[in-house]
Amino acid sequence: LSSAASDVYKRQAYGYGRALAVWLIDKGYLVKDVNTAISHRQAKHRGAMYRKSDSDDAEAIALATLNMLDKLPDACPNDAYWSLGQLVHRRDNIMKQRTRLVNQLHEQLCIAYPSYKQFFNDISRPTALYFWEHYPSRKYLKGKSVEDLRAELVPVSHNKCSTKTCEKILDAVASDKVKNNAYQDARDMVTLSIVSDLQHYDSQLTEVDKMLEQMYKMLGCTLTTIPGVNVITAVKILAEIGDIKRFSNANKLAQFAGIAPLHLSSSGKGKDVATKQGNRRLQVTIYFLAIQMVQLSSKGTPRNPVVRAYYEKRKAEGKTSQQALICISRRLISIIYGMLKHGTEYRMPVVESAGEK
């Protein structure tokens, strides 16, 4: 490639792309980040859907870069954001594995303890896991009194397990009409194995969350000042956005997230529709954040009065709930962009009353 004009090289954002981007930037080249959805669309337009090879992918990326040079974000392979993304990805994998294990535990408990939902709402909490570990089936509870069980569970539950809870456990187990199943010892071993895996993943999750919180503080981010945004949500957003300097304005960030509406028009008439392009992980995170912000508390008060008022305003204009949430997502993008760009904290605007203009 010649070093003409702005010296632009094209790359995929995953796999070996980061190492290549680092090398090219060190050489003084401008590197653009091409989303896989954009290169896939380019491949469809040139009729190459059924010719899948490395050379076809490279051509699609090159054409996408040439056609959308000014719209694509600059690649910024910052080590801090890259490491943050690795941690977020690891946490997501742990949560997926944990969900799979919880479902497997449900299958075992349905047979061993038919009434288990009466005494443990969340079967994967530390107290519940301790119980399944020491009492994988009802036969291990023989001879156990309420006092004995409470003395055992109180330290594990940090004094939250009451005598009433222990009575509920023993009464529910006694009322179950369950006959002695053959080969219960084999199923008990399965339960113990699942519990051990859950405890292992919980330990890993704790360590990952600690590191994520440390990195969040190290980056000096202020996103947690937004109501409804905790550290985990904030680091998910940061991991996908990376260095905010690669986006010249909020519109570029909205396009990157796939939240900017796509305008379709013909014969002077047109409409805005939701785009299927962009960073899906960032798009989903922002969308679910918008859902949390418009929700009402148990007392009926809005969690974020400003966002709720904007949501009701859009609904009154004839927009559907989904369209209103997309509008909120777009506003959140602008807020997040400004906070990351200037390092400012979120300030709750004042909701104007109906009589105010």
Residue map of PLM features:
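Single conserved hydrophobic/aromatic residue that forms the stacking wall/gate
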Residues: 1-9
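Basic, amphipathic alpha-helical segments enriched in Lys/Arg and hydrophobic/aromatic residues
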Residues: 315-357
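Short alpha-helix plus adjacent loop in nuclease-associated cores
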Residues: 32-73, 133, 137, 269-277
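A short, charged helix-loop
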Residues: 62-86, 173-178
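Acidic, metal-coordinating catalytic cores used for nucleic-acid/nucleotide bond scission
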Residues: 10-20, 270, 274
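Glycine-rich, often acidic, oxyanion-interacting loops/wings at catalytic, nucleic-acid
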Residues: 92-219
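Phosphate-backbone recognition surface of nucleic-acid-processing proteins
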Residues: 222-225, 231-317, 321, 356-357
